[in-house]
Swiss-Prot record:
Originating species: Metallosphaera sedula (strain ATCC 51363 / DSM 5348 / JCM 9185 / NBRC 15509 / TH2)
This protein's domain notes: The winged helix domain is involved in binding to DNA in the preinitiation complex.
Protein's recorded name: Transcription factor E
The keyword S-adenosyl-L-methionine is annotated on this UniProt entry: no
Summary of subunit composition and partner proteins: Monomer. Interaction with RNA polymerase subunits RpoF and RpoE is necessary for Tfe stimulatory transcription activity. Able to interact with Tbp and RNA polymerase in the absence of DNA promoter. Interacts both with the preinitiation and elongation complexes.
Domain HTH TFE/IIEalpha-type: 5-89
Any single GO BP term: regulation of DNA-templated transcription
Key words, A-Z: DNA-binding, Transcription, Transcription regulation
GO molecular function: DNA binding
Pfam families, A to Z: TFIIE_alpha (PF02002)
Length: 176
């Protein structure tokens, strides 16, 4: 089960932040303990500033967290980092809510606009854009044709319903 969660976290990090944070996240997941940024930098053979930059990006999305203590000898703060494996469900729910909001915004855009499309390059324009260009494609000059976005709206409505049901199920399971 841990392998699945680790992979899920890596996939999420890759989707949100790209490939460069995976080395630091993988290292934290593999070690299963709290580590300082200096320890990670030494083991990964990377500059401490690079590791910190990646850790801050991961923390911003809730994938890692830290505990801060003061070094008694130097008086400096030491940060101990760990992967938030135990919070993966909350992270996934949060991500689904973000996607849901984007889909709802897109549905509203599709519902509140009339569209025209270029038959050549398939670029879609709102009525206002088409009107400004005299219903000709600004790229190639071809006459724009009316585009019925009913299928797109149906698709978005279906996806919104699916994600809302998933969120409701997962919220119910999480609270029981």
């Amino acid at each position: 089960m841990t392998g699945n969660i680790d992979q899920l976290m890596k996939d999420m990090a890759r989707d949100l932040l790209g490939e460069d944070v995976i080395d630091v996240l993988s290292f934290l997941l593999d070690n299963k303990t709290e580590l300082t940024d200096e320890e990670m930098a030494n083991k990964l053979n990377v500059k401490v500033n690079e590791v910190r930059k990646k850790l801050y990006a991961l923390a911003e999305h809730g994938l890692v967290s830290y505990r801060r203590t003061r070094d008694k000898e130097t008086g400096w703060y030491v940060y101990y980092w760990k992967a938030n494996v135990d919070q993966i469900n909350e992270l996934l729910l949060s991500r689904k809510r973000e996607i849901l909001n984007k889909l709802k915004a897109r549905l509203e855009y599709e519902t509140n606009n009339e569209f025209y499309i270029c038959p050549e390059d398939k670029t879609k324009y709102t009525f206002e854009e088409a009107f400004e260009n005299e219903f000709k494609c600004p790229k190639c000059g071809v006459q724009l044709v009316y585009y019925d976005s009913a299928k797109m709206r149906e698709f978005l409505e279906r996806k919104i319903k699916e994600i809302e049901e998933e969120i409701a199920r997962e919220t119910k399971v999480g609270s029981s």
